[in-house]
Amino acid sequence: MNMTVRTIKTDAQTYSPAQQEQAQKCNVPIYLYPGAYAQRHGEIEEYRASRQANIACRDAIDAAIREHFRDNVLSKKAVQSVIGQYGFDRTMYVLAVTVLDKDGDGRISQSNRNWAKMQPIFADPDDRGNERNRAFVVRAHPGLTDLFLREVRHEKAASLEKKMPQMKKQKSEMER
């Protein structure tokens, strides 16, 4: 038995079925298009998997805010825990949908509202005209959600700055 198979079996024994399912949701690609588009193009399974991962991410954001907001301070651990589990892309997608849903809420900063409007979010109405994206709108207090998003955007910018020297180095090596 090689090391990879042994590791997979060990992981399967270590984690509960719920934890294994959660880990799988983290690796699901984001499906940007509405359910009707997915249905027409035979991509309904991808749509559903992405939707479930979005809901799980929303729950993780709510839990992180609840667990890491103390004494009027949102700990950086809140953002790090969600980003570590779901990555920047899904976390930012769920937050963009949340901000767009709360567009008239003054507790969301103008900066975050402008950012959300620039994200590729498609309306996803059901047969009754209700927006399906609301299923993964963050439920935490809008002011705390705004703080969380501000920190996510800051962390994303910092991670891009860290990658910049590496990218420049790779580019110069390619030009040689």
Which positions does each model-derived feature cover?
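Gram-negative host-targeted secretion-system effectors, predominantly Type III and Type IV
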Residues: 1-175
